[in-house]
Amino acid sequence: MNANAPVQPSLDDLLGRIVRDDVRAMGAYHVPDASGMVKLDAMENPYHLPAMLRDALGKRLAEVALNRYPVPTADALKAQLKRVMRVPAGADVLLGNGSDEIISLIAIAAAKPGATVLAPVPGFVMYAMSAQLMGLKFVGVPLRADLTLDREAMLAAMAEHQPAVIYLAYPNNPTGNLFDAADMDALLRAARGPVCQSLVVVDEAYQPFAQHSWMPRLPEFDHLLVMRTVSKLGLAGIRLGYVAGHPKWIAELDKVRPPYNVNVLTEATAAFVLDHVDVLDAQAATLRAERTRLIDALSAQPGVTVFPSAANFLLLRVPDAAGLFERLLKRRVLVKNVSKMHPLLANCLRVTVSNPEENAQFLDAFAASLQDTP
């Protein structure tokens, strides 16, 4: 062995030399094992497609040319989405591998030196994460104690930080509430006026359960994008998101979009299901009715606060979120403990609204777990 040979650095040293410090300090997104559980942690639609449609979809997918790349523009699917989802005339659409990819594309396109992304908090974690990974500053503006939007604080933050991008989730995740429409309108107008000049992205991932939308108002605001996903409608497994807005915004985002980001199976599945959107709409209506039933039942439990929800999940405040979460796990019910995400969410759990059978199992387990409180 040559004594003068350079010492080979350890793998940890090599990682430290190459990987960014902030990335090394991060933790990977953890998805818990839900095998054998009543799974109420991820805001999924509990319903399958009807058997007849599943058979027809299987035949459609069998005809897909898996040996060919997707058509990069996906013009046919975009035209179908515009028609079914009532995208206003004159607006254009961009597709993404889920909304997460679209959020990343917005961050890439807006990542000028010193640029800022602003959003109410607590909110969807990907707004901050995508900003951090692209080198943008993220500014979170706390909601009020009742989890409503703080218009004055938002306007002050917009004036101070001059954000490139403002995210407004409608309904908000993880709180589930719809922000006041007058507050939203005021922020939209301020973002294109004397306060700042910003792109505003309204995230409508849960729109099927809210039945309120900013999509019809796209023609009023040339700085507004409306982002949605098909995940919450019952297609979480195919990972398809879309964003609508002025064609000039869509053209800029399209420049940073990978050319084959939506695979052929996703495209074919979405096109098929959009021809049967009435089935998904009926499922959403059932879940809205179940949401009301859950709210009534949970509100009757001692020490439980149920926050208003226009989504397919409920945010609950309980005396001991960590303990109740563990007791639910022992009863094979998985919910989301969000109590450490933000101080405003202290002792809060987030629960997906499911079908009547799973909701009944959850309510039984919840009541029993409350009674087990030490």
From Swiss-Prot:
Q: From which residue to which does the signal peptide run?
A: none
Among SUPFAM superfamilies, the record links this protein to: PLP-dependent transferases
Q: Which reaction does it catalyse?
A: L-histidinol phosphate + 2-oxoglutarate = 3-(imidazol-4-yl)-2-oxopropyl phosphate + L-glutamate
Q: What is its EC number?
A: 2.6.1.9
UniProt GO molecular function:
histidinol-phosphate transaminase activity; pyridoxal phosphate binding
Any stretches that span the bilayer, and where are they?
none
Pfam family of the protein (one): Aminotran_1_2
Keywords from the named record: Amino-acid biosynthesis, Aminotransferase, Histidine biosynthesis, Pyridoxal phosphate, Transferase
- Which PANTHER family does the entry mention? HISTIDINOL-PHOSPHATE AMINOTRANSFERASE, HISTIDINOL-PHOSPHATE AMINOTRANSFERASE-RELATED
Q: Which family does it belong to?
A: Belongs to the class-II pyridoxal-phosphate-dependent aminotransferase family. Histidinol-phosphate aminotransferase subfamily.
Q: How does it assemble?
A: Homodimer.
> Which NCBIfam families does the protein's record reference?
hisC
Record-given protein name: Histidinol-phosphate aminotransferase 1
Species of origin: Ralstonia nicotianae (strain ATCC BAA-1114 / GMI1000)
The record's gene field reads hisC1
